[in-house]
């Protein structure tokens, strides 16, 4: 016996083996690529950049959003043989802006150095413990 149960926002449908083996009669409606309310990826069907795409991680709306949009647009629309090679000024402006907000835009080098420093301290502590243990066992 098939039945349906609502749990909060979820609808749970239990079906029998026979129901599951019967071909579905559900009609799928094709997405309208021109629907302005439909979710799209980074590039919209018309070729424009979707600044609301979650894939940008909020970069387009942060304190350096305008610089990011300028650099990203330049790169996206670049016709140079080496794509984006004509966008150096925009990327420099974006980088300079991001350096003003290190809490929002941490530098990868800073993170890498901090992680390496932490690992070195842990390794030193471990080697000190190991040598102390060896000295105790040899006594």
From Swiss-Prot:
A motif (Cx9C motif 1) lies at residues 64-74. Gene3D superfamilies: 1.10.287.2900. It comes from the Eukaryota. Residues 102-139 are annotated as: Disordered. GO terms for molecular function: protein-disulfide reductase activity. Residues 115-124 have a biased composition (Basic and acidic residues). Disulfide bonds join 53-55, 64-97, 74-87. Keywords: Disulfide bond, Mitochondrion, Oxidoreductase, Protein transport, Redox-active center, Translocation, Transport. PANTHER family: COILED-COIL-HELIX-COILED-COIL-HELIX DOMAIN CONTAINING 4. Central component of a redox-sensitive mitochondrial intermembrane space import machinery which is required for the biogenesis of respiratory chain complexes. Functions as chaperone and catalyzes the formation of disulfide bonds in substrate proteins, such as COX17 or MICU1. Required for the import and folding of small cysteine-containing proteins (small Tim) in the mitochondrial intermembrane space (IMS). Precursor proteins to be imported into the IMS are translocated in their reduced form into the mitochondria. Monomer. Can form homooligomers. This is Mitochondrial intermembrane space import and assembly protein 40. It comes from Xenopus tropicalis.
């Amino acid at each position: 016996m098939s039945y349906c149960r609502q749990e909060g926002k979820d609808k749970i449908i239990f079906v029998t083996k026979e129901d599951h083996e019967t071909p579905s009669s559900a009609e799928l409606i094709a997405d309208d690529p021109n629907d302005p309310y439909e979710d799209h990826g980074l590039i919209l069907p018309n070729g424009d950049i979707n600044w609301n795409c979650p894939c940008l991680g909020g970069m387009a709306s942060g304190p350096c959003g305008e610089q990011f949009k300028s650099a990203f647009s330049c790169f996206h629309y670049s016709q140079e043989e080496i794509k984006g090679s004509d966008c150096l000024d925009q990327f420099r402006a974006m980088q300079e802006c991001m350096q003003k907000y290190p809490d929002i835009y941490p530098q990868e080098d800073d993170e890498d150095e901090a992680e390496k420093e932490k690992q070195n301290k842990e390794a030193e502590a471990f080697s000190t413990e190991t040598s102390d243990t060896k000295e105790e066992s040899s006594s």
